[in-house]
Swiss-Prot record:
Gene (UniProt): TPS-LAS
GO BP: defense response; diterpenoid biosynthetic process
UniProt xrefs under PANTHER family: (E,E)-GERANYLLINALOOL SYNTHASE, ENT-COPALYL DIPHOSPHATE SYNTHASE, CHLOROPLASTIC
Residues reported to bind Mg(2+) 4: 392, 394
Protein's recorded name: Bifunctional levopimaradiene synthase, chloroplastic
Pathway the protein acts in: Terpene metabolism; oleoresin biosynthesis
Organism: Picea abies
Reaction(s) catalysed by this chain's protein: (2E,6E,10E)-geranylgeranyl diphosphate = (+)-copalyl diphosphate; (+)-copalyl diphosphate = abieta-8(14),12-diene + diphosphate
Length: 859
């Protein structure tokens, strides 16, 4: 991977005689070439350039002296030694072995998960005791004094928990248990049955209701302040012995009254809102004839069985009854808190397996799920179900991001539905409270912006602010879900947004954060077994460790290649085989891309070697000789090269002959000429930079970018590696990712700019004159350095948005090739997140990323 170091060949102005550096008098002087030998010197004398080492990593100070006898000598340039020595790698890989039975278990899990996806219908979820109690209230439509759905009443009688409550036994949430228990004891009392259960429920209520005061407001279920006080009033009329004067009960009643006072009467009937979800708590104020006009197509009121049951008992509406029969046909003797959940289930299931890094096993299933979602996509947004009339930002943002990345035509304008006049984003129309999970999903969505999508930039700014504040407020977690580690998810998303979140690192992180027993909060607590389950997690762990073991074998082979090529003798360059291999392993990690990873790593290593050679080590004459040797592919020129350059060329010649032969087998045609041409263009860019340095020439910003986007060498790595992505690449396809393509140019541009923003200060301190920042300041001498840096960041961010569009829309290029280009751009954003992550990898987070990706198995 071409992660360019600071250029050292341009540190002394032509014509300079001396550079006095008394502060570094005790440092060692190391000779360096000076191309214009007689420039600015007295007749018969030559200038010699020296480099002195100062304090800190790779800190170099230049000085010039006159020497009438000696010719200029080559630089002895040193870098921090490589961290990943063989003994370090061996110490991390020897303790973990992948069991032979794991592969069979992986196959079994893949088959079981495929069946889960294929069986997706309207959404699978757990019983809601609260909603079942409301459905059980309905009297028989034939006029008999029996329940219309006796099986639901029986379910209540049979499903009381040992502590006297109703709800999910594995997770105690006081809000949820108290609400469900109150609903059940009222229903049993109305039907004059289950006296023992009622008494046990009352005792639970008395002893546990006070615990609500200790729970965070964010754990209060949706509509609790509407339905709970209404049911308490009903319980009081029924004569149930409950602690009606508890402080928290008074507070909830006050919240209800305040909310209803803020509610304009006309809005309840003007358009569908979340109030339709809680109509059972608004019975004293609802005009039932008006409310029927807002009924969903499926007969429900916002997919809520409880709300729909309340409307039916008031109106006798046949569509309400049809909906309730439809739900009970699915679940038998109980109902969930809302149904259907078809869009929610599919989107979150796809998102889950993608984040866990196992999506490659389920391509057909993902396509089927997304085709289904897209068929119900609405430009005003979507909700959790296909016929839900109230869109929410959570499902909409998740859908926008995933559908866009999978090539579906969706517009970011859909987010405008959820923005208020103050520029803030909300989950539902008319709602002011937000949750961490929905804002997290909007934030993730905002990073897949296209050029000119200001709504995405606004969403990014708004949600980043909200999420950073939420990290400081424990009570902010969370309104819509009780997740294993939502805080960890937020921290990861803010630190590693889309453009520097590599698939393998995200999988590693999400495996740790993912909760197979996570629950969501609607009107009651509910689970989604096709979203949160042990099978996803087990497969993710087994698959991660299996792939990691393959990567370790590949890395050992590549390290042997480095040694056998004689590159350990090259003291002027960086040995970073492991860090470079980490790059393709972090995104093209699948077993079938083993050759692609090897070619990517070898090519990238040569871009580093030759960058260091052209940047600071070889004379212009030697560099011209090397370039000619590559152009002519002529071994006879090797004898004229210095020893270290011979090693470079022989390794280069042998390696790319081997790569070309393998490419011929893969592509069915000779590719050596193609590879040589790719390298000729690369070496021309290196040579131009060397010439600029020798002449102390500072190009314009545009001139600099034109060359630097090539010299960054990402294009060279990608164009050669693309031959090994498993696709037969025609000339037409190659042209779409070739040097002239906008896709490749954007990759090089963003890579160059992120490099410069993090290294220009250090390079300037070493005497470097050309960087994006410095060249822009030359064009605009009136601006400050801070303004120039801001401009460079703006150019880069706009280019990343354009890169998103190229990645998504460039469908004439095979998926694997698109990934190769796009992910190479993203890995640069990661490597240069905090500085020079290649040269100083041992001092940056890259060291931990390498360890987690390649060596540390997941438990």
């Amino acid at each position: 991977m071409a992660l360019l170091s600071s250029s050292l060949s341009s540190q002394i102005p032509t014509g300079a005689h001396h550079l006095t550096l008394n502060a570094y008098a005790n440092t060692q002087c190391i000779p360096h070439f000076f191309s214009t030998l007689n420039a600015g010197t007295s007749a018969g004398k030559r200038s010699s350039l020296y480099l002195r080492w100062g304090k800190g990593s790779n800190k170099i100070i230049a000085c010039v002296g006159e020497d009438s006898l000696s010719a200029p000598t080559l630089v002895k340039r040193e870098f921090p030694p490589g961290f990943w020595k063989d003994h370090v790698i061996d110490s991390l890989t020897s303790s973990h072995k992948v069991a032979a039975s794991d592969e069979k278990r992986i196959e079994t899990l893949i088959s079981e998960i495929k069946n889960m996806f294929r069986s997706m219908g309207y959404g699978d979820t757990n019983p809601s005791a609260y909603d079942t109690a409301w459905v059980a209230r309905i009297p028989a439509v034939d006029g008999s004094e029996q329940p219309e759905f006796p099986e639901t009443l029986e379910w209540i009688l049979q499903n009381q928990l040992k502590d006297g409550s109703w709800g999910e036994g594995f997770y105690f949430l006081a809000y949820d248990r108290i609400l469900a228990t109150l609903a059940c004891i009222i229903t049993l009392t109305l039907w004059r049955t289950g006296e023992i259960q009622v008494q046990k429920g009352i005792e639970f209520f008395k002893t546990q209701a006070g615990k609500i005061e200790d729970e965070a407001d964010s754990h209060r279920p949706s509509g609790f302040e509407i339905v709970f006080p209404a049911m308490l009033k009903e319980a009081k009329v029924l004569g149930l012995d409950l602690p009606y004067e508890l402080p928290f009960i008074k507070q909830i009643i006050e919240k209800r009254e305040a909310k209803l006072e803020r509610l304009p009467t006309n809005i309840l009937y003007a358009l569908p809102t979340t109030l339709l979800y809680s109509l059972e708590g608004l019975q004293e104020i609802v005009d039932w004839q008006k409310i029927i006009k807002l009924q969903s197509k499926d007969g429900s009121f916002l997919s809520s069985p409880a709300s729909t049951a309340a409307v039916f008992m008031r109106t006798g509406n046949k569509k309400c009854l049809e909906f309730l029969n439809f739900v009970l046909k699915k679940f038998g003797n109980h109902v969930p808190c809302h149904y259907p959940l078809d869009l929610f289930e599919r989107l979150w299931a796809v998102d889950t397996i993608e984040r866990l890094g196992i999506d490659r096993h389920f391509k057909e299933e993902i396509k089927d799920a997304l085709d289904y979602v897209y068929s119900h996509w609405d430009e005003r947004g979507i909700g959790w179900a296909r016929e839900n009339p109230v869109p929410d930002i959570d499902d909409t943002a998740m859908g926008l991001r995933i559908l866009r990345l999978h090539g579906y035509n969706v517009s970011s304008d859909v987010l405008k539905t959820f923005r208020d006049e103050n520029g803030e984003f909300f989950c539902f129309l008319g709602q002011t409270q937000r949750g961490v999970t929905d804002m997290l999903n909007v934030n993730r969505c905002s990073h897949v912006a296209f050029p000119g999508e200001t709504i995405m930039e606004e969403a990014k700014t708004c949600t980043e602010r909200y999420l950073r504040n939420a990290l400081e407020d424990v009570g902010a977690f969370d309104k819509w879900a009780l997740k294993k580690n939502i805080r960890g998810e937020v921290e990861y998303a803010l630190k590693y947004p889309w453009h520097r979140s590599m698939p393998r690192l995200e999988a590693r992180s999400y495996i740790e954060h993912y909760g197979p027993n996570d629950v969501w909060l609607g009107k009651t607590m509910y689970m989604m077994p096709y979203i949160s389950n042990e099978k996803y997690l087990e497969l993710a762990k087994l698959d991660f460790n299996h792939v990691q073991s393959l990567h370790q074998k590949e890395l050992r082979d590549l390290r042997r290649w480095w040694t056998s090529s004689g590159f350990t003798e090259l003291k002027f360059t960086r040995e970073r085989v492991t860090e470079i291999y980490f790059s393709p392993a972090s995104f093209m990690f699948e077993p079938e891309f083993a050759t692609c990873r090897a070619v990517y790593t070898k090519t990238s290593n040569f871009t580093v070697i030759l960058d260091d050679l052209y940047d600071a080590h070889g004379t212009l004459d030697d560099l011209k000789l090397f370039s000619d040797s590559v152009k002519k592919w002529d071994l006879s020129l090797v004898d004229r090269m210095p020893q270290d350059m011979k090693i470079c060329f022989m390794g280069f010649y042998n390696t790319f002959n081997e790569i070309a032969e393998e490419g011929r087998k893969r592509q069915g045609r000779d590719v050596l000429g193609y590879i040589r041409n790719v390298w000729e263009i690369q070496l021309e860019a290196y040579t131009k930079e060397a010439e600029w340095s020798a002449a102390r020439y500072v190009p314009s910003f545009d001139e600099y970018i034109d060359n630097a986007s090539v010299s960054i060498a990402l294009g060279t790595v990608v164009l050669i590696s693309a031959l090994f992505t498993g696709e037969i690449l025609t000339d037409d396809v190659l042209s779409k990712i070739g040097r002239g393509s906008r896709f490749l140019q954007l990759m090089g541009l963003t890579g160059r700019l992120v490099n410069d923003t993090k290294t220009y200060e250090a390079e300037r301190g070493q005497g470097e004159v050309a960087s994006a920042v410095q060249c822009y300041m030359k064009d605009h001498p009136e601006i400050s350095e801070e303004e120039a840096l801001k401009h460079v960041y703006t150019v880069m961010e706009n280019a990343l948005d354009e890169l998103n569009r190229e990645f998504v829309n460039n469908r004439e290029v095979p998926d694997s090739c698109r990934r190769l280009v796009f992910e190479t751009a993203r890995i640069m954003q990661l490597f240069y997140m905090d500085g020079d992550g290649l040269t100083l990898s041992h001092e940056t987070e890259i060291k931990e990323h390498v360890k987690n990706c390649l060596f540390q198995p997941v438990a």
